[in-house]
Amino acid sequence: MIKIAINGYGRIGRNVLRALYESGRDKNIKIVAINELAAPEAMVHLTRFDTSHGRFHHPVQLAGNSMLVGEDLISLFAERDPSRLPWRALGVDVVLDCTGVFGSRADAELHLAAGAGKVLFSHPAEADVDATIVYGVNHQVLTGRERIVSNASCTTNCVVPVIETLHREFEINCGTITTIHSAMHDQQVIDAYHSDLRRTRAASQSIIPVDTKLAKGLERILPHFAGKFEAIAVRVPTINVTAMDLSITVRKKVTVTDVNQALQRASRGTLSGILDYTEEPLVSVDFNHDAHSCIIDGTQTRVSDANLVKMLMWCDNEWGFANRMLDTTRAMMAAG
């Protein structure tokens, strides 16, 4: 039995819990605790009802200082200092740190000092962590000795399997990526102050360029592409699902059919459950609650002069990533 604790019960933290239960309940994983500074009543309410993902089809209620999900009692804490949490007493194997705030080795060591066996960040971390994992691409590097791991980002999990597949088939020279991301909690409902002047503007009224470290994150997973990719990102007025526009140049001459068939083969083979492929005339909302890391829209693949390839891919930046958090947790524990 893998005992996990969730530190930070926001969009990803709640989706991790929902994904664990909705997937038929992996009997080998149990959530034993949640640490969140919000009111317990609000935590229960947002577990039961979700604007993006609908109602949670398991009974949830408060039970003293715990949350009862079905027959499972999950201890609730509101502690700012992770080193003071009772991870040792609870026998926590892995802390899923979903705060979006912590991200260094020193941050993770606070959980380890409290008695946790390992820590998995739900976001890109500093370079001093033991490993950064994109499940399906490099989770095999886990040896069991890693105690502090990052699950990268939702966009890295979306684009890296595609880049790795196409590089293996056609030898990529370089590329650019545009992320078209749904609005996030760090944006404003109406114009208000923010250190990023673009994010002072109302999220529902504009397409908003934001900074992204996606290219650096990609290099950490695929170091042979250091300096070969650049990325930009915009936020759009939707609440979930992200599109990614990938352009690459390749050494081998290719056609649209070549590219699409390579991705279809990968989706049926080594990347089954991670990568999906469609040619249906779908829009972003159709990918809401899709557990894949990436869904290729084959109708949008373009090739210019046999070497310049452009394609469109989708991901549910919440649900898909939450499922990868669970996959990486299993891989960390299976490695030893």
Swiss-Prot record:
It is found in: Cytoplasm. One of its GO terms (cellular component) is cytoplasm. The active site is at C154 (nucleophile). The keyword Oxidoreductase applies. CDD domains: GAPDH_C_E4PDH (cd23937), GAPDH_N_E4PDH (cd17892). Gene3D superfamilies: Dihydrodipicolinate Reductase, domain 2, NAD(P)-binding Rossmann-like Domain. NAD(+) binds at R11, I12, R80, N317. Substrate binds at S153, C154, T155, R199, T212, K213, R235. It catalyses: D-erythrose 4-phosphate + NAD(+) + H2O = 4-phospho-D-erythronate + NADH + 2 H(+). Keywords: Cytoplasm, NAD, Oxidoreductase, Pyridoxine biosynthesis. Its EC number is 1.2.1.72. Its main location: cytoplasm. InterPro entries: E4P_DH_bac, GlycerAld/Erythrose_P_DH, GlycerAld_3-P_DH_cat, GlycerAld_3-P_DH_NAD(P)-bd, NAD(P)-bd_dom_sf. GO terms for molecular function: erythrose-4-phosphate dehydrogenase activity; NAD binding. It is an enzyme of class 1 (oxidoreductase). Signal peptide: none annotated. GO terms for biological process: pyridoxal phosphate biosynthetic process; pyridoxine biosynthetic process. Pathway: Cofactor biosynthesis; pyridoxine 5'-phosphate biosynthesis; pyridoxine 5'-phosphate from D-erythrose 4-phosphate: step 1/5. The record marks H181 as: Activates thiol group during catalysis. Catalyzes the NAD-dependent conversion of D-erythrose 4-phosphate to 4-phosphoerythronate. Belongs to the glyceraldehyde-3-phosphate dehydrogenase family. Epd subfamily. Homotetramer. This is D-erythrose-4-phosphate dehydrogenase. It comes from Aeromonas hydrophila subsp. hydrophila (strain ATCC 7966 / DSM 30187 / BCRC 13018 / CCUG 14551 / JCM 1027 / KCTC 2358 / NCIMB 9240 / NCTC 8049).
